[in-house]
Amino acid sequence: MHSARFLLAATLSIGFVSAQTCDRACLKTTLDQYLNAVVQHDPKSAPLFAGFRQTDNGVVVRPGTGTWQSITSLGKVQRSYFDPVSGQAAYLGLIEEGQATDVATLRLKIEDKKITEAEWVIAREGAIGPGGTNGGNLYNLAGFLAEPPLTRTVAANQRASRELLIAIANSYFDGLTTHDGSIIMAHPGCTRNENGTHTAGPNPNPDAAKGKAKGGGGDCTSNLTNFSVALISARRYPIVDVEQQVVLGMGIFLRKPGVKQLRNLLAEWFFVEDGRIRNIWASMFYPTNDLPVPNWPPYDANLPFPAEFAAPPASPAPAAVPGRGASK
């Protein structure tokens, strides 16, 4: 009798989990519904959970405000990635806010076919840079158009496991904080594109810089000695798209004590081939010192910039390497 009851309970439990699972097709449909609702400025047309929560660059906004009002259309580059295990979907590409075009990452969490979370990381032209002045951020629309993120389906026998993909992505953050590129699990010549600016590896479209810093020195493991980051806090890997071999890593770059640069909140996309990073794309912004970021659980690193990190330097800080120290 007890065995029969256990089997019945287990069967019902499996059925319940199956009913709640959102596969790739479900995630894609939900992501499309949300993006269409945002463009239409109509939260009611998206399947939002009653307790839905959204942040725009770390700031909580109510449905119908923030990006719900400002985004007028999606841009020419639109990429989508899905993680049925975590129940999350993401967008990497361009968005239009009136006459402005931005580089953006969007993360959605879906539970029981309802959107419970939305997180935007948006790079806008003319935004505040690491030095605290407007227009100091990396931004290159032409570079993003010329070097768009990949979309692909990797053969099953060539895919790294979910666990290995996360470890590969985390090795990049470990390499940055230890200032040792040999720790990073990456191919020689791995590339990096930040807010459309090519900052590491061979540049497939050097003319796209249009007079801006062309970057591309070394590769994604190079020039870390003077990288002005003491800690990458609040590391998260919400999207692990095993089918496309893509990982979304998110974190906060905290500067070395005495370095007068703002923190950096990043959405860093890792594209993996044969168990190593081949390409990186990132959208990012520089939060002011009083803004709690990333403003998502577990909230461990959601503090304003610590005073000891923001203190004026006793002596000039070492020169930062363009594209990493100066820009990130």
Protein language model regions, located:
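Sec-dependent signal peptide recognition
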Residues: 2-9
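Hydrophobic h-region of N-terminal signal peptides that target proteins for export
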Residues: 10-18
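C-terminal and inter-domain tail/linker signature
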Residues: 19-328
